[in-house]
């Protein structure tokens, strides 16, 4: 994709993001350099320590476009999945498939606590059978450790006047978007094996494979929407009551 084409796509994409935000008093949690580092570092730390080990787990890096989408959705103060992610070009100017995890708390928010809740679902997941315990959910865990997902963007927002579909009078929403999306039907989250087996030592860092193309064009980044679980079940929420 040329620079001119990329700019054109971005120009079409940005207004759709702005339309997601709702006016009203709320306390924004700034996307500072520290916030970004904590999100990326904690994701990579958890991805590098999966059990069984992963042969193809990609190192995650920050994506400003995914972060803008996550932030915009958190600012709507809605306790539900972002329907725009199911529409091509609405969630990101280049990636066609986007995964999403959401965490809501009425207590003190921290990136580490949110990811701790997501990764805790791993005890319910049977890798060899690629199944979750009956009537349980593991989709946030499997998205977090999805081997092919290598781009990440998160945003958080505090809603003092309440969150739609959240029982508490106020709370904080934390949203992370991933590309390409995980939780693709019939696929394991990653390939079991010795760390970095699929990428070799030249592309290995801390048991994670560095993706050789950090800025893929539209075609190489795309995955069919029909293969992605982008329903409410792929964005399961955890209530944390204090």
Annotate each language-model stretch with its function.
Residues 2-242:
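Mature extracellular or exoplasmic CAP/SCP-family domains and secreted bioactive peptides
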């Amino acid at each position: 994709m040329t620079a001119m084409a990329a700019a054109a796509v971005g120009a079409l994409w940005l207004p759709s993001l702005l339309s997601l935000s709702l006016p009203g008093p709320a306390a924004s949690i700034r996307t500072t350099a520290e916030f970004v580092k904590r999100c990326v570092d904690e994701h990579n730390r958890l991805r590098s320590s999966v059990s069984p080990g992963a042969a193809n787990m990609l190192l995650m890096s920050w994506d400003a476009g995914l972060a803008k989408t996550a932030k915009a959705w958190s600012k709507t103060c809605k306790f539900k999945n972002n329907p725009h992610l199911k529409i091509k070009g609405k969630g990101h100017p280049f990636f066609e498939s986007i995964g999403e995890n959401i965490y809501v708390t009425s207590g003190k928010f921290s990136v580490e606590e949110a990811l701790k809740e997501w990764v805790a679902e791993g005890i319910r997941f049977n890798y060899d059978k690629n199944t979750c315990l009956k009537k349980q959910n593991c989709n946030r865990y499997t998205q977090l450790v999805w081997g092919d997902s290598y781009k990440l963007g998160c945003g958080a927002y505090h809603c003092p006047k309440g969150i739609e579909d959240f029982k508490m009078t106020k709370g904080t929403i934390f949203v992370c978007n991933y590309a390409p999306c995980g939780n693709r039907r019939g696929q394991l989250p990653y390939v079991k094996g010795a760390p970095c087996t699929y990428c070799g030592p030249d592309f290995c860092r801390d048991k994670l494979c560095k993706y050789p193309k950090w800025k893929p064009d539209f075609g190489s980044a795309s995955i069919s929407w029909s293969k992605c679980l982008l329903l409410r079940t792929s964005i399961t929420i955890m209530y944390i009551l204090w």
